[in-house]
């Protein structure tokens, strides 16, 4: 009998990752480009849909590119692309579908189950929206678990015999989460959670981008903030510089031909950025990391001295200033035994392994991220399930009527920490009718909350005298109907082959256009021999003809030929550079369209 495979997916704001259990050990699956993470970016170009690195390269230059869609999960907001509206679930489903497809190819089998992680602060609607995205992508979501909990699960897999208190410091590309967990005898219990949903590595990138824009404006008296091509290069260069400064004290950002000045001359910009300057520019971001840590510790009712391990999660935790802050706050050396980009997906895969019976002796106890209450007389939010209650859980309480002979009660369920219901988020409401006439306070109405292992809630109301009852499942109150989900699943399946063909052809044309541009630049260079210029002009003509004729077989052959030609040109340029003693330094250069540089 073939063993069941359940994918562990970290569906991140900036990057996503997938892992599975093989021989009782988690392994991270590489994507088709050989990378272990996938940018959570989707780009539309006519019939073509790009996901991941290919989409990220068009993030600024193509206005029909969507990133950080996770921020909209569980809301009614939609994105309009090429005159068509897409829900956040639909965009997320394209990322999940891409991950599912390459996982199936890697493992050589069909896969239809997954465990997906979400931030600890995701509410019920956001969790249900994540499940819906999985369904649209053709996945049964077996479990939704919190990202910090997944990270702790990954960390604890080899240390089940040690009782420990763990602080999980999770700084990703777009969100920041802190959790305090108790781990003992194979059981993980979340004691507290805190965080900032709008703080992540992207903010550090933006600081460098702003610094570069000002530096270029000061030196060349030009504003590049509206120049899409230039901004894409600045974004790529900023991310590279940030990553580089995690390992060296100084890096050089080189941006040749970044724009044209007022006289039509090309602008070549180069500037050093050292770690001290970078840390000074971003000190306000570092400061914002403190409060969530202190809040989580306060709520856990533990002191920092009680913490045994600080687990770093998310690529942004590689920054030395972040690590120094953690040491300063906790007095502990941060634990780097796990890859921060992959640890959440690994934890999700382990949970999948538990559900599939591949791994034993682990019990995952998750918690409710916010207090769940009902609205009572005077608009008060009366809590039934406090924040950080372990789930699954079921709790009930008896209420009564607010007026004499009241025939029905309206049950309004809210989520949040405020005392008044109006100040919290309304999750849903329903009515229990048919209450027998009686003075106020006499009827007994039992309200029962039930939350399953995915954090999805149902509420039941019963008249204890008549035994009449009614209930509601809080099911994506801000999102999609089942009909919409079914329609999207059908559309995704019907267009799968067509999408793949169109994607290949469009990528080929994009490569050809990029090569034509590169060849044209080389032809304009003075020190290139005329013979080589003639060869390049010939290739420009061949590429252009094949592209315009939509002869994709010929175009593919010509693209390969030109890439070989450019490789030889690169060798020539390298020899020229080696002859110049003034050009012997390590630079960080922006990515070109064809550059697949390492992403966080």
Curated annotation (Swiss-Prot):
Residues 572-600 are annotated as: Disordered. PROSITE patterns: HSP70_1, HSP70_2. It comes from the Bacteria. Gene3D superfamilies: 3.30.420.40, Actin, Chain A, domain 4, Substrate Binding Domain Of DNAk, Chain A, domain 1. Residues 591-600 have a biased composition (Polar residues). Coiled coil: none annotated. The modification Phosphothreonine is found at residue 175. GO terms for molecular function: ATP binding; ATP-dependent protein folding chaperone; unfolded protein binding. Keywords: ATP-binding, Chaperone, Nucleotide-binding, Phosphoprotein, Stress response. Disulfide bonds: none annotated. Pfam families: HSP70 (PF00012). Induction: By stress conditions e.g. heat shock. Belongs to the heat shock protein 70 family. Acts as a chaperone. This is Chaperone protein DnaK. It comes from Ureaplasma urealyticum serovar 10 (strain ATCC 33699 / Western).
């Amino acid at each position: 009998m073939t063993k069941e495979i359940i994918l562990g997916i970290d569906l991140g704001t900036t990057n996503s990752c997938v892992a599975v259990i093989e021989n009782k050990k988690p392994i991270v699956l590489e994507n088709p480009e050989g990378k272990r993470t996938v940018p959570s970016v989707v780009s539309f170009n006519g019939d073509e849909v790009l996901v991941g690195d290919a989409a990220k390269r068009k993030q600024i230059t193509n206005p029909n590119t969507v990133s950080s869609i996770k921020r909209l999960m569980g809301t009614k907001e939609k994105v309009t692309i090429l005159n068509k509206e897409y829900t956040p679930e639909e965009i997320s489903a394209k990322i999940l579908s891409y991950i599912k497809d390459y996982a199936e190819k890697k493992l050589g089998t069909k896969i239809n189950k997954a465990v997906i992680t979400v931030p600890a602060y995701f509410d019920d609607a956001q969790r249900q929206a994540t499940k819906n995205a999985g369904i649209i992508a053709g996945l049964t979501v077996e479990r939704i678990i919190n990202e910090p909990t997944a990270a702790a699960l990954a960390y604890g897999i080899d240390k089940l015999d040690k009782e420990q208190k763990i602080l999980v410091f999770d700084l990703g590309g777009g969100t920041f989460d802190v959790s305090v967990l108790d781990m003992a005898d194979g059981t993980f219990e979340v004691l507290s959670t805190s965080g900032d949903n709008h703080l992540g590595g992207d903010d550090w990138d933006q600081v460098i981008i702003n610094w570069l824009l000002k530096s270029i404006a000061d030196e060349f008296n030009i504003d590049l903030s509206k120049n899409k091509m230039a901004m894409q290069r600045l974004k790529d260069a900023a991310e590279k510089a940030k990553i580089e400064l995690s390992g060296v004290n100084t890096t050089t950002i080189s941006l040749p031909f970044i724009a044209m000045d007022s006289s039509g001359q090309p602008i070549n910009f180069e500037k050093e950025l050292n770690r001290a300057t970078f840390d000074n520019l971003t000190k306000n971001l570092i400061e914002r990391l403190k409060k969530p840590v202190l809040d989580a510790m306060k709520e856990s009712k533990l002191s920092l001295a009680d913490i045994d391990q600080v687990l770093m999660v998310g690529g942004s935790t590689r920054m030395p200033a972040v690590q120094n802050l953690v040491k300063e706050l906790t007095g502990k050396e941060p634990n780097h035994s796990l890859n921060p980009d992959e640890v959440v997906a690994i934890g999700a895969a382990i949970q999948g392994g538990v559900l599939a019976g591949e791994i034993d002796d682990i019990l995952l106890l998750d918690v409710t991220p916010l207090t769940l209450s009902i609205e009572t007389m005077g608009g008060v939010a009366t809590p039934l399930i406090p924040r950080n209650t372990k789930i699954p859980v079921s709790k009930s309480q008896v209420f009564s009527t607010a007026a004499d002979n009241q025939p029905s009660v309206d049950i309004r369920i809210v989520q949040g920490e405020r005392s008044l219901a109006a100040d919290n988020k309304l999750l849903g409401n329903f009515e229990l009718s048919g209450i027998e006439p009686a003075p106020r306070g006499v009827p007994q109405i039992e309200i029962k909350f039930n939350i399953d292992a995915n954090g999805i809630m149902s509420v039941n109301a019963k008249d204890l005298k008549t035994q009449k009852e009614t209930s509601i499942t809080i099911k994506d109150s801000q999102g999609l109907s089942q009909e919409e989900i079914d329609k999207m699943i059908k559309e995704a399946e019907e267009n799968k082959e067509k999408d793949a063909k169109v994607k290949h052809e469009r990528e080929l044309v994009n490569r050809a256009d990029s090569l034509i541009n590169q060849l044209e630049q080389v032809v304009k260079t003075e020190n290139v021999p005329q013979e080589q210029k003639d060869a390049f002009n010939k290739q420009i003509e061949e590429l252009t003809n094949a592209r315009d004729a939509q002869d994709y077989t010929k175009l593919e052959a010509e693209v390969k030929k030109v890439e070989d030609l450019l490789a030889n040109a690169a060798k020539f340029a390298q020899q020229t550079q080696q002859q110049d003693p003034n050009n012997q330094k390590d630079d960080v250069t922006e990515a070109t369209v064809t550059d697949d540089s390492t992403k966080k």
